[in-house]
Design a protein with these regions (language model features):
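Acidic, divalent-metal-coordinating active-site segment for phosphoryl/phosphodiester hydrolysis
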Residues: 163-177
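Conserved catalytic/ligand-binding micro-motifs in nucleotide and anionic cofactor chemistry
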Residues: 204-462
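Conserved non-catalytic scaffold segment of RNase H-like nuclease domains
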Residues: 1-126, 140-162
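Amphipathic alpha-helical transducer elements in NTP-driven molecular machines
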Residues: 65, 86-89, 144, 165-168, ...
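A short, structured active-site edge motif that brings together acidic residues
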Residues: 126-135
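A residue-level signal for conserved active-site and pocket-lining positions in enzyme catalytic cores
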Residues: 73, 92, 102, 167, ...
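Acidic two-metal-ion nuclease catalytic site recognized across multiple nuclease folds
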Residues: 1-13, 176-221, 225-227
Length: 462
């Protein structure tokens, strides 16, 4: 690859970000993040006044399809002697970790790169700047923003297309041209707006190092102060991106001294790890506010013994946290809960008066209205028998968003490492390995999403 020190405008613009930046391009065996692999990697790394080029073919450890060979010129024989990504990973990681990655369609290159590192057991994450979006933002008068269109529009000399090294140089030349045409101030404004995630202000060296050592996948992240006391705890789907956004937006977050991260196979696993960290540090939900004003309140049913020894169904707010006893049912509001309780009692032949779920307007001393019609359990069951049937039927209380299901086994698989874990959920809560139950305000929406998108990973137990 050419020395690009002749691109002074680009070098200055990237230096203004205050951290290294790399213009990167990958060639792959196809477009699937799950099944395709990298065949070529190239980048230009800008760090202050130094520009470091890198290029390598990569053995994908699978056949290269004919279409890709025709498109890129890279076939099986081209990569026959090339190293697999696993042999390059430890060389690449220190060059790219902590960099801003610029790429034409950055989601493609970033995701392939992140997942290639993950398959090697190496967490990798980076802020990204998509040069397709940057072209659209800087040149809105044009309709096409593919690299071919940009090369033609700006008269950029390109030795070939769909080869990583040549594409990197073409993107670098385009950015230098855009800086010359638009000016550094305009370029910087658009670039900073499009950068994802936004960069936090200057951080203590140790905290910055820990931030850039995070993965951009699922996990539980604990923020600690200088004394090792917990400041904030959250489960994440994209740990690095979400942590960086928090640091950019919150001065309080920037007061953290260190981070502790537990990677997860999926979002349910992340919630169990969040529960684990909360227990380890003795952190109560009230000490870890998670935008409580925006959270939906959920209700559940707890079985409580009344004055006469009769088991009653009591509606209670289901708060985030760990519980010794299982919650029964999950309801978005009191109206839905009361209606569900009445239908549940009727369907299971239980007495609404004994359960203390009579509608408003009925006092406890009022004769059971169901008994007056001659069809209530209080006419046939003794108290102990009714209590036993109530306890047995409690698991059949409905759960919002689960349809007719009451208890589930949900499997999560890490697509990169192959780690597979199963989780028991019942009554709207997670059953933890120690026998306790855990609820988080994000859990109902998460399981509803899994019903919609991952039904094949759910086994309905009850």
């Amino acid at each position: 690859m050419d020395d690009v020190s002749q691109r002074p405008l680009l070098a200055a613009a990237l230096a203004a970000f205050g951290r290294p930046a790399a213009i990167i391009d990958l060639e792959t065996t196809g477009g699937s993040f799950d099944t395709d692999r990298i065949t070529e990697i190239a980048f230009l790394r800008f760090d202050g006044g130094t520009v470091t080029p890198y290029h390598s073919l990569v053995h994908p450890e699978r056949p290269i399809p004919p279409f890709i060979r025709r498109l890129t010129g890279i076939g099986d024989e081209t990569v026959a002697g090339a190293p697999p990504f696993s042999a390059l990973a430890h060389e690449l990681l220190p060059l790219l970790r902590g960099c801003i990655l610029l790429a034409h369609n950055s989601k493609f290159d970033y995701t392939f790169l992140r997942r290639a590192f993950a398959r090697c057991g190496l967490p990798f994450a980076a802020p990204t700047l998509c040069t397709v979006q940057l072209s659209r933002s800087l040149y809105p008068q044009f309709y096409k923003h593919s690299l071919e269109s940009i090369i033609e529009r700006h008269g950029i000399a390109a030795a070939s297309r769909h080869r990583a090294a040549d594409d990197v140089l073409a993107v670098a030349d385009y950015l230098e041209t855009a800086l010359r045409e638009q000016g550094a101030e305009t370029f910087a404004a658009h670039a900073h707006h499009l950068l994802q995630p936004k960069l936090p202000p200057a951080l203590p060296a140790a905290l910055e190092e820990q931030l850039y050592a995070l993965s951009d996948g699922c996990g539980a992240l604990l923020w600690l102060d200088e004394s090792g006391r917990p400041l904030h705890l959250a489960a994440h789907r994209h740990a690095f991106s979400e942590a960086a956004r928090r640091l950019a937006a919150s001065e309080q977050a920037r007061a953290a001294a260190s981070l502790r991260f537990l990677p997860a196979a999926g979002p349910l696993h992340a919630l169990t790890l969040k529960a684990q960290l909360a227990a380890e540090y003795g952190l109560r939900p009230s000490e870890n506010p998670q935008h409580a004003a925006a959270q939906q309140d959920f209700l559940t049913v707890r079985l409580r013994s009344g004055e006469n020894g009769c088991v009653q169904a009591k509606l209670e707010r289901l708060s985030d946290g760990r519980f010794a006893e299982q919650p029964y049912g999950l309801f978005p509001n009191k109206k839905a809960a009361r209606q569900a309780l009445v239908e549940w009692a009727r369907g299971n032949g239980l007495c609404p008066q004994r359960l203390d779920i009579l509608p408003d307007g009925y006092s406890r001393d009022t004769p059971c209205p169901a008994a007056l019609s001659g069809g209530c359990a209080c006419l046939s069951d003794g108290l102990e028998a009714h209590n036993r049937r109530t306890a047995a039927a409690a698991r059949l209380l409905p759960v919002a968003g689960w349809g007719r299901a009451h208890a589930l086994e949900i499997t999560e698989t890490d697509a990169d490492t192959g780690v597979q874990l199963s989780f028991a959920c019942s009554g709207g809560a997670l059953h933890l390995p120690d026998g306790s139950w855990y609820f988080d305000h994000s859990l109902p929406a998460l399981i509803k999403e899994k019903f919609k998108k991952e039904r094949h990973n759910i086994r309905v137990c009850v």
